[in-house]
Amino acid sequence: MEKKSLLILGTASHVGKSSVVTAICRILSRNYRVAPFKAQNMSLNSWITKDGKEIGIAQAIQAKAAGTEPTADMNPVLLKPKGDCVSQVILLGEPYADKSAGQYYDSIEEMNGVLEGALERLWKEHDIIVMEGAGGAAEINLYERDVVNVGTARLTQAPIILVGDIERGGVFASLYGTVALLPEDVKKNVKGFIINKFRGDPEILKPGLKQLEEITGIPVLGVLPHFKLRIPSEDSVSLGDKEGAKNEKEVEIAVIRLPRISNFTDFEPLEGLVKVHYVDIDEDLGNPDAIMIPGTKNTINDLLDLRASGMDKKIQAFKGKIPIFGICGGYQMLGRTIFDSGVENGVEAEFEGLRLLDIGTKFGEYKKRTIQVTKKVNGYGPILKSIDGEDIKGYEIHMGVTDSNRTVFGDDGAIDEEGLVIGTYLHGLFDNENIRNALVRYLCEKKGLEYRPEEIISENDAYEELANRFEQNIDMEKLYEIAGI
């Protein structure tokens, strides 16, 4: 069977490659067995597969849009920045090593073998693979070490569609310049352009589109309008693009934007209900209705940065007044102490936490817990009492072990005596409708506001909405021709 594939590259980061791949996966899945693939992803937002492997959340979303189970082969290399130019390398879903950029590039040959194996396994089970590049495709300083753009193009010889973002300006120069800078053996496979995030009447673009096609000999497949995606974001670049909720003047949740923040997608489900405001650690915290401390790639360093900035005292001042949630690394920070045997920060030491929960955490070995879980709510306190005994789902991605005398979700997490400080290892907590609504209902009632339940759109409907918008604006006949299907 012919190994069919399609490669989506971009002119820069955050131009919409992931959403384009998601849309194409959804559309093609109606008639074909489709798998997404991203050779190398650098992201702190990750997902745990059913067999406990860790991959980038974008590939999990794309797989679900394609109607297939996410697997580690769809994102064989995941880089999770830890700071100081060092990243944790996740190889086929398992922690491999902490490497500097130079050390990682020295192991590129080894990575290429991993990628080839992953692709072969995917092709055995699927009719077509829709692949995604990373950042800008024309990073000429990286061509000899690149595995995700030029490297994937050379490995698969896939037809390429190049995506540009018009919202930030300069899209024609970006598309033309990217093609001009690509190596000749890759350039020949660029078969189409997509312009993304356009606001206004697309008629005014026609002269530019025509000229771009004449200069490059490459057709423009369509112009996608700017619209609000209802699927999770991939990286922290998009934190600056968050739109307010319809009730943003009524209820506000402050998320502490830790220097090494990870899995900020945990809070996206709240954005349709309240204003979710990301606060840098050196900013004024203001007067929020709830505080969230997210996950982090380095709990201890972010805890030390919180303390150095004075944000620790600002958070502590709200104890007993408003809900304070900590997820994963944020949960660990809420406790009395964190003991590190050297696996987290390089040296053996004990650090004082925020002391908002009666827990202690120990980093004893370089071992990560990655698992999908279902837990029952222990309905202690004013927020959770209405959903006592109900099930919630989530996933864990963490190092360290935490002791807790008063758990909050089954055997997980902790809650203080007043029921307002809640810590948990569960990512995806607010994906659960019962948790989400219990919190927002409490916040509304506390302010004397009428609680208005959210307008719920299912995950499946969100994928269909994206796919339909794509089909309405893209020359699908030409796209099928390019893909060879």
From Swiss-Prot:
Keywords: Cobalamin biosynthesis, Glutamine amidotransferase
Family matches, as SUPFAM superfamilies: Class I glutamine amidotransferase-like, P-loop containing nucleoside triphosphate hydrolases
Pathway: Cofactor biosynthesis; adenosylcobalamin biosynthesis
Active site (catalytic residues): 328 (nucleophile), 427
Alphabetized PROSITE patterns for the sequence: GATASE_COBBQ (PS51274)
GO biological processes: cobalamin biosynthetic process
Any Pfam family matching the protein: CbiA
Recorded superkingdom: Archaea
Domain GATase cobBQ-type as annotated: residue spans: 250-435
GO MF entries: ABC-type vitamin B12 transporter activity; catalytic activity
Role: Catalyzes amidations at positions B, D, E, and G on adenosylcobyrinic A,C-diamide. NH(2) groups are provided by glutamine, and one molecule of ATP is hydrogenolyzed for each amidation.
Protein family: Belongs to the CobB/CobQ family. CobQ subfamily.
Protein name: Probable cobyric acid synthase
Organism phylogeny: Archaea, Methanobacteriati, Methanobacteriota, Stenosarchaea group, Methanomicrobia
